[in-house]
């Protein structure tokens, strides 16, 4: 038996053991989404600035369909076909709510939004997208639902998507939006101090027309990057949006939202929990303006993606929508 063969065999064994123990540490489990019971269709919209976004529509049965569509907006680095999003969409359709799991220009880590007439590539996604522009995509999805006959929708923003749906409604006051759901949102402004060196780098690159260039974010446990233009967009976001619920801000953007809102977290390893929900609710209710009806819930055994608890998420949203949006 050759020395080279022994080394190769040992490497294979070590790799296998490493994969096994990594799997144990990560608590890997097989994907377990059940097939949908009702029609599902891949759909597309085009925003006013010519950015095309894809999504999937879960259509409820006609004899049980509610007069309200649900539009689910993904989180950072995600997309419309995240397995738990699909499971939630299917479960909502079973409960009579036609649901659209929708991409915005912020989907995935990186994407190509479009090409300009001059042939320039415009990038999007978590590394390159300009978050403040995804309101155009949300408006396009609401228009799509309206074209299907739904004059009222509920917007659900998951993880980073909460900020997109909240800012959209605060700025637009869209009368077609009957309610907002914040699924695992950030409550309160970031406690991480801005890095002046990183900001200076970003500003210099943007001023030089190199906003697509990537910056490496310091002090991260794994390599993390962001484009100069995206970083500038985030850093210059007004505090009324970064402290959307008014935990420390006297005039937050939520004061311009009048529809009912709901927020929830998973109880198992989500980014926050009941303490944050209580802070959100008390902060909004002390304001002189804004939504008067604020509901909160915990998704029992749910993680940040609600894996395995998709039906519970759907039931939570459906009950709230039936009580707050369809009976008033």
Task: Give, region by region, the residue ranges found by the protein language model.
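Alpha/beta-hydrolase active-site loop
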Residues: 117, 122-148
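N-terminal cap/lid segment of alpha/beta-hydrolase-fold proteins
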Residues: 26-62
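Short, surface-exposed "cap/lid" segments of acyl-processing enzymes
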Residues: 62-108, 113
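Conserved alpha/beta-hydrolase "acid-adjacent" motif
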Residues: 270-280
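Primarily recognizes the serine-hydrolase "nucleophile elbow" in alpha/beta-hydrolase
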Residues: 143-205, 209, 236
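Accessory cap/linker subdomain of secreted extracellular hydrolases
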Residues: 183-251
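Catalytic active-site module of serine/aspartate enzymes centered on a nucleophile-bearing elbow/loop
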Residues: 295-328
């Amino acid at each position: 038996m050759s020395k080279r063969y022994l080394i190769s065999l040992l490497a294979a064994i070590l790799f296998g053991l490493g994969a096994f123990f990594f799997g144990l540490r990560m608590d890997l489990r097989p994907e377990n989404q059940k097939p949908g019971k009702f029609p599902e269709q891949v759909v597309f919209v085009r925003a006013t600035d010519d950015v095309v976004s894809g999504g999937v529509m879960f259509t409820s049965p006609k004899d049980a369909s509610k007069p309200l569509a649900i539009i689910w907006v993904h989180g950072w680095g995600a997309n419309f076909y995240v397995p738990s999003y699909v499971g939630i969409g299917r479960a909502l359709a079973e409960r009579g709510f036609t649901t659209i799991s929708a991409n915005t220009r912020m989907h995935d880590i990186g994407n190509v939004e479009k090409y300009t007439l001059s042939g320039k590539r415009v990038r999007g996604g978590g590394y390159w997208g300009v978050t403040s522009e995804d309101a155009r995509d949300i408006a396009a999805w609401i228009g799509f639902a309206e074209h299907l006959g739904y004059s009222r929708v509920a917007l659900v923003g998951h993880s980073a998507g909460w900020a997109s749906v909240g800012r959209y409604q605060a700025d637009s006051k869209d009368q077609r939006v009957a309610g907002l759901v914040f699924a695992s949102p950030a409550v309160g402004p970031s406690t991480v101090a801005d890095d002046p060196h990183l900001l200076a780098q970003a500003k210099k690159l943007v001023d030089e027309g190199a906003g697509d260039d990537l910056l490496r974010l310091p002090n991260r446990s794994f390599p993390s990057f962001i484009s100069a233009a995206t970083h500038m967009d985030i850093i210059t976001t007004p505090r009324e949006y970064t402290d959307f619920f008014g935990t420390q801000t006297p005039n937050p953007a939520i004061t311009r939202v009048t529809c009912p809102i709901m927020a929830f977290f998973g109880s198992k390893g989500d980014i926050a929990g009941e303490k944050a929900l209580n802070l959100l609710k008390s902060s909004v209710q002390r304001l002189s303006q804004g939504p008067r009806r604020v509901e909160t819930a915990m998704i029992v055994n749910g993680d940040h993606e609600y894996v395995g608890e998709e039906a519970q998420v759907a039931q939570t949203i459906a009950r709230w929508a039936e009580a707050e949006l369809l009976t008033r």
